[in-house]
């Protein structure tokens, strides 16, 4: 996406959300989320968060990049991160819960770095952004937190991939009945 970002064309936060949730673009809408099982949400959110982290790693954080696109991409990342924390934390799978806790700890670990960009880490691990402060941050400062070599995005992608995998396993078990209690009395 770095090619698109440097073309001078401004892409909206919704564009990035649709891109992150490309398998099921309705999943970032509150009305759809209310009607969807938590297992499915955890899977879709993990997949979307992995895409979001990779997207942020793909930007060239230089003065030539379109800062508005980077800002909108980060805002969409934050929405996706928050969705993932909520669905993972509410999952019945202990594995999925574990990776949601890792994500929560990760955001707290990097809260000072995020705060310097105008991003507040709440007590539950979710994030909120001050768009004005984020937009005024230097590209190099943003790149230190979200760039290709940044530990925060690397770890986010790692935990999201593991959460997606465990959620997929849970969905498969629910669909096939594997892992269920089997009554051997006949």
Provide a role label for each language-model segment.
Residues 2-186:
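Polar, low-complexity export/assembly segments characteristic of proteins
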């Amino acid at each position: 996406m770095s090619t698109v970002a440097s073309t001078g064309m401004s892409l909206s936060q919704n564009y990035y959300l649709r891109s992150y949730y490309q398998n099921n673009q309705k999943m970032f809408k509150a009305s759809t989320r209310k009607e969807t099982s938590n297992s499915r949400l955890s899977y879709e959110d993990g997949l979307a968060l992995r895409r979001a982290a990779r997207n942020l790693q793909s930007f060239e954080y230089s003065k030539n990049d379109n800062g508005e696109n980077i800002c909108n991409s980060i805002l969409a990342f934050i929405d996706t991160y928050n969705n993932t924390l909520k669905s993972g934390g509410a999952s019945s799978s202990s594995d999925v819960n574990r990776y949601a806790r890792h994500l929560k700890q990760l955001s707290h670990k990097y809260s000072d770095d995020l705060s310097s960009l105008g991003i507040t880490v709440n007590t539950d691990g979710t994030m909120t952004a001050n768009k004005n402060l984020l937009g005024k941050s230097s590209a190099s400062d943003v790149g230190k937190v979200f760039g290709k070599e940044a530990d925060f995005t690397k770890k986010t992608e790692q935990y999201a991939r593991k959460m997606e995998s465990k959620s997929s396993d849970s969905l498969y078990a629910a669909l096939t009945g594997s892992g269920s209690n089997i009554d051997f009395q006949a």
